[in-house]
């Protein structure tokens, strides 16, 4: 029986990515823009039910709830080419309008206000599932709605469905050229929720997405449509084993269990190859796609959809790797490729766990024509992800020393009396950075047991001292 997944998209970026994702899933399953199965879609080995359900008239409808605080993006989806695909009851925007003004606190407060209506939609979809496995939250953490409202939803969904998995696709801001001046505040406050309430976070960032667009598409300035296409390609590939199941990794819990050995270190990076012209216009052609070639390319930093330093720290290493290889692949080729990669020490692993690349083989959609035989997605848990969090903390500290823009946050009830929430968020993220650094050492198994470990109430004081110091 398929384990269903409910997709919740929040804010402008989340809904634009979600819209692109659904158009891609329709193409891969032979579903028309109206939700009708095409006459030529005769392959019945796929599991459409994971992401779609059938209405009484047999139309396929996405298991999706779309939420925003202002109507512009949702209106464009409702009037776009896929307007008849979605359940019209599953669109929500705040009747007060106006959005969150790139303010996490405003988005969070709006979440409290609209909670009942939004949760009614989520509950209805969840109860309509036979065997709900979990949720996918799509959002950005730089602005106001995706970060603030997204954070509130994450907390509430975790409380309401404690036994269901929550995986997020979280777009992190470009640290060097962000257009939201308060993005370090918004990012840090969101990070606390992603650390404490999500089971798995797939980190994407605008800087890496733009760089891939420049490299593959020959465009100086990537449009949102182009970067969203990259993200939807990765989302489609990461859910391929759920929709075209094989012997392994055919549910979300199996994938997460293999990638996340410890609960807090659940931030994953992705790499994908090849981004070729059948997916995105103008993309560079990759002439040869053998299994070895694809698996080598996946380990190259330039194919990552997240910006980590190209020269990582000496001790940086992989905690785990799962390669999802799509296409007609001979398992013996996979075995040979893994041996070659191991011989060349292409990937450095943690000293306290298995040093192995896991591989899941899955077929490509028979309805989407590709120019390559093999494509691959790498989901990886790498200690160097902490460098992104360090950058966020450093930028936060610069603003917080001057209490810059703080009055905007103090207008909301959460920050009226004090700024403890900021201190707690900073301490949570600092703890996370330290845990990823501890993962690089052989004695990580004992981490958290020693006298130097700070937890609970001491976190807030620790965060405040770090900023003032």
From Swiss-Prot:
GTP binds at residues 142-148. GO terms for biological process: cytoplasmic microtubule organization; microtubule nucleation. It comes from the Eukaryota. Disulfide bonds: none annotated. The keyword GTP-binding applies. It holds the Pfam family Tubulin. Coiled coil: none annotated. Keywords: Cytoplasm, Cytoskeleton, GTP-binding, Microtubule, Nucleotide-binding. InterPro entries: Gamma_tubulin, Tub_FtsZ_C, Tubulin, Tubulin/FtsZ-like_C, Tubulin/FtsZ_2-layer-sand-dom, Tubulin/FtsZ_GTPase_sf, Tubulin_C, Tubulin_CS. GO terms for cellular component: cytoplasm; gamma-tubulin complex; microtubule; spindle pole body. CDD domains: gamma_tubulin (cd02188). It is found in: Cytoplasm, Cytoskeleton, Microtubule organizing center, Spindle pole body. GO terms for molecular function: GTP binding. PROSITE patterns: TUBULIN. The keyword Acyltransferase does not apply. PANTHER family: TUBULIN. Belongs to the tubulin family. Tubulin is the major constituent of microtubules. The gamma chain is found at microtubule organizing centers (MTOC) such as the spindle poles or the centrosome, suggesting that it is involved in the minus-end nucleation of microtubule assembly. This is Tubulin gamma chain. It comes from Microbotryum violaceum. The lineage of its organism: Eukaryota, Fungi, Dikarya, Basidiomycota, Pucciniomycotina. The gene is TUB4.
């Amino acid at each position: 029986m398929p384990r269903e997944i409910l997709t919740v998209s929040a804010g402008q970026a989340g809904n634009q990515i979600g819209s692109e994702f659904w158009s891609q899933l329709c193409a891969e399953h032979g579903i028309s823009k109206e939700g009708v199965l095409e006459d030529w879609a005769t392959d019945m080995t796929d599991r459409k039910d994971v992401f779609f359900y059938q209405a009484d008239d047999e139309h396929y409808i996405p298991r999706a709830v779309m939420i925003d605080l202002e109507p512009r993006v949702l209106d464009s989806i409702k009037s776009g080419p896929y307007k008849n695909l979605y359940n019209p009851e599953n669109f929500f925007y705040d009747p007060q309008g106006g959005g969150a003004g790139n303010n996490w606190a405003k988005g969070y407060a709006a979440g409290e206000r609209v909670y009942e209506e939004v949760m009614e939609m989520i509950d209805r979809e969840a109860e309509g599932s036979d065997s709900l496995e979990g949720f996918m939250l799509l959002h950005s953490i730089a602005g106001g709605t995706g970060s603030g409202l997204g954070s509130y939803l994450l907390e509430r969904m975790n409380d309401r469905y404690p036994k269901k998995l929550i995986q997020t696709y979280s777009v992190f801001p470009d640290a060097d050229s962000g257009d939201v001046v308060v993005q370090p505040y918004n990012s840090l406050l969101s990070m606390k929720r992603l650390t404490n309430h999500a089971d798995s976070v797939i980190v994407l960032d605008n800087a890496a997405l733009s760089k891939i667009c420049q490299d593959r598409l020959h465009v100086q300035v990537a449009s949102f449509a182009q970067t969203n296409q990259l993200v939807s390609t990765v989302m489609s590939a990461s859910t391929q084993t759920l929709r075209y199941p094989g012997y392994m990794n055919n549910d979300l819990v199996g994938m997460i269990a293999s990638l996340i050995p410890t609960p807090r270190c659940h931030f994953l990076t992705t790499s994908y190859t090849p981004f070729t012209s059948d997916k995105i216009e103008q993309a560079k052609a990759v002439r040869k796609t053998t299994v070895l070639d694809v698996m080598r390319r996946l380990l190259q930093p330039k194919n990552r959809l997240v910006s980590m330093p190209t020269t990582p720290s000496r001790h940086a290493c992989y905690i785990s790797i799962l390669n999802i290889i799509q296409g007609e692949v001979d398992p013996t080729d996979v075995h040979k490729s893994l041996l070659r990669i191991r011989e060349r020490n292409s990937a450095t692993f943690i000293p306290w766990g298995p040093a192995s690349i896991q591989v899941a083989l899955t077929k490509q959609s028979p309805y989407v024509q590709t120019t390559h035989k093999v494509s691959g997605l790498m989901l990886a848990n790498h200690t160097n992800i902490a460098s992104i969090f360090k950058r966020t903390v450093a930028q936060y500290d610069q603003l917080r020393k001057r209490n810059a823009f703080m009055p905007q946050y103090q207008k909301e009830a959460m920050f009226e009396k004090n700024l403890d929430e900021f201190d707690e968020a900073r301490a949570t993220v600092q703890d996370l950075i330290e845990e990823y650094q501890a993962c690089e050492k052989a004695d990580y198994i004992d981490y958290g047991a020693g006298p130097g470990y700070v937890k609970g109430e001491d976190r807030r004081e620790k965060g405040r001292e770090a900023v003032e110091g």
